[in-house]
């Protein structure tokens, strides 16, 4: 049986950063990363943006080249999947039947694309957006595709819609709620992006009720049937309605959890010597007033990886990173700082018509978060307002001529 001092399951941002952080902090033990894809760790956000549009080749989205891992003695066990975990025996069993022992286990598996509760997912031309294989399959179909239906008006769906619209495709976005980005942003930002997509020719349908995905006798997708019986024609369907955390082996082994696996402030699960990080980790977040949440972001994956690595090495620094996120759509660069969970007021700073503005989220007058569209200065200067829990003058906050840094307490 192979044996590693630290075994990392998941070859995404979190898994890669865990290995990097261990070596950066002078860990000299053996490390291996198990990944279910054949590729080296790569950046996932570009799959619905720069890689999908052809702006970046795959080599340019690798987190590190092969030589980096070899030079740091990190073994890459790629194209392999963990089937079960034995906490008592400190080992995992792969789907091929082989067993690997560990001293510490870091679970960084992210999640699998959530599917609609309807038929048609098996049809050729229906895609999720999680892996390079997903993106390559879509790219391979682009030439013969004229019309696309995107199910889900979140960031992944809207980013894909922007790329497809720019490529000249007829795009329809179906969102079940009454606005796009409803789960992650306030109404001002939602309406702005809805208008932008409509201006680029995207048909945005809100309150949309999908009945099923339909296809021909060759099992090729032909459209999406709505609850009223109408069918929206499509050569391609992209489903972007969130993920299901990939934690089944840990839960089966006895780890506490449900919507992900529960971790403490050091990213430890309830099982001995097992950590969980990134999209699959349910944690108490100070920027959500201590609520237990999962964060699906590169920032969270990387920062939790560093927290876990340092704790493995005996550190006592708890996870307390300010959340941030970004999205590129058309020529719009959205940058978010903090979490808007529980906000009771928003202030729009600047004019959305100028395509450069910020939305500030407040609770009891205190700044929780900012969404900054083509407003880098607000994003950079707003971090201190979020981390400091500042309650600035609202008129000054709404005035884009007043730099945010001047609103900090003296």
Curated annotation (Swiss-Prot):
Catalysed reactions, semicolon-separated: 2 reduced [2Fe-2S]-[ferredoxin] + NAD(+) + H(+) = 2 oxidized [2Fe-2S]-[ferredoxin] + NADH
Molecular functions per Gene Ontology: ferredoxin-NAD+ reductase activity; flavin adenine dinucleotide binding; oxidoreductase activity, acting on NAD(P)H
Tagged with keyword Flavoprotein: yes
Keyword set, alphabetical order: FAD, Flavoprotein, NAD, Oxidoreductase
Summary of subunit composition and partner proteins: The chloroacetanilide N-alkylformylase multicomponent enzyme system is composed of an oxygenase component (CndA) and an electron transfer component formed by a ferredoxin reductase (CndC1) and a ferredoxin (CndB1). In vitro, chloroacetanilide N-alkylformylase assays in which CndB1 is substituted for CndB2 demonstrate that the two enzymes possess nearly identical activities.
EC number: 1.18.1.3
Pfam families documented for this protein: Pyr_redox_2, Reductase_C
Official protein name in the record: Chloroacetanilide N-alkylformylase, ferredoxin reductase component
InterPro entries: FAD-oxidoreductase/Apoptosis (IPR050446), FAD/NAD-bd_sf (IPR036188), FAD/NAD-binding_dom (IPR023753), FAD/NAD-linked_Rdtase_dimer_sf (IPR016156), Reductase_C (IPR028202)
Entry keyword annotation includes Oxidoreductase: yes
Family under the similarity heading: Belongs to the FAD-dependent oxidoreductase family.
Required co-factors: FAD
Function: Component of the chloroacetanilide N-alkylformylase multicomponent enzyme system involved in the degradation of chloroacetanilide herbicides (N-alkoxyalkyl-N-chloroacetyl-substituted aniline derivatives). In vitro, catalyzes the transfers of electrons from ferredoxin (CndB1) to NADH. N-dealkylase utilizes NADH, but not NADPH, as the electron donor.
Top EC group: oxidoreductase
Superkingdom as given in the UniProt entry: Bacteria
UniProt-annotated binding residues for FAD: 14, 36, 49, 82, 130, 279, 298
Record lineage: Bacteria, Pseudomonadati, Pseudomonadota, Alphaproteobacteria, Sphingomonadales
CC annotations in GO: cytoplasm
């Amino acid at each position: 049986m192979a044996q590693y001092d630290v075994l990392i399951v998941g070859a995404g941002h979190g898994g890669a950063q865990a290995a990097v952080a261990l070596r950066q902090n002078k860990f000299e033990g053996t490390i291996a990363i198990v990944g279910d894809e054949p590729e080296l760790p790569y950046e996932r956000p570009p799959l619905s943006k720069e890689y999908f549009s052809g702006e970046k080749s795959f080599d340019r989205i690798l987190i590190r080249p092969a030589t980096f891992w070899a030079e740091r003695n990190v073994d890459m066990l790629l194209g392999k999947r963990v089937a079960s975990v034995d906490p008592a025996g400190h080992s995992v069993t792969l789907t091929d039947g082989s067993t690997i022992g560990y001293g510490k286990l870091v679970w960084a598996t992210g999640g699998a694309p959530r599917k609609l509760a309807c038929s048609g997912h098996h049809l050729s031309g229906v895609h999720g957006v999680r892996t390079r294989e997903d993106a390559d399959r879509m790219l391979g179909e682009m030439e013969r595709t004229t019309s696309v239906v995107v199910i889900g008006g979140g960031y992944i769906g809207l980013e894909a819609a922007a790329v497809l619209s720019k490529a000249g495709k007829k795009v329809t976005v179906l969102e079940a709620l009454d606005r796009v980005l409803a789960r992650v942003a306030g109404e001002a930002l939602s309406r702005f992006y809805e208008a932008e997509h409509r201006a680029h020719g995207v048909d945005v349908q809100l309150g949309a009720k999908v009945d099923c995905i339909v296809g021909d006798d060759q099992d090729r997708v032909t459209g999406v049937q709505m609850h009223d019986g109408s069918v929206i024609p499509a050569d391609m369907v992209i489903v972007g309605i969130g993920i299901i955390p990939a934690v089944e082996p840990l839960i089966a082994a006895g780890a506490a959890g449900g919507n992900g696996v529960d971790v403490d402030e050091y990213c430890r699960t309830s099982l001995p010597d097992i950590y969980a990080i990134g999209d699959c980790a349910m944690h108490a977040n100070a920027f959500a007033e201590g609520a237990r949440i999962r964060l699906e972001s590169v920032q969270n994956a990387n920062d939790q990886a560093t927290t876990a690595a340092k704790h493995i090495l005996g550190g006592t620094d708890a996870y307390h990173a300010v959340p941030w996120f970004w999205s590129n759509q058309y020529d719009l660069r959205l940058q978010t700082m903090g979490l808007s969970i529980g906000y009771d007021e928003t202030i729009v700073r600047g004019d959305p018509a100028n395509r450069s503005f910020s939305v500030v989220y407040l609770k009891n007058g205190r700044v929780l978060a900012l969404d900054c569209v083509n407003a880098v200065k607000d994003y950079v200067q707003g971090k201190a307002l979020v981390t400091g829990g500042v309650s600035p003058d609202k008129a000054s906050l709404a005035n884009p001529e007043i730099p945010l840094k001047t609103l900090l307490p003296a």
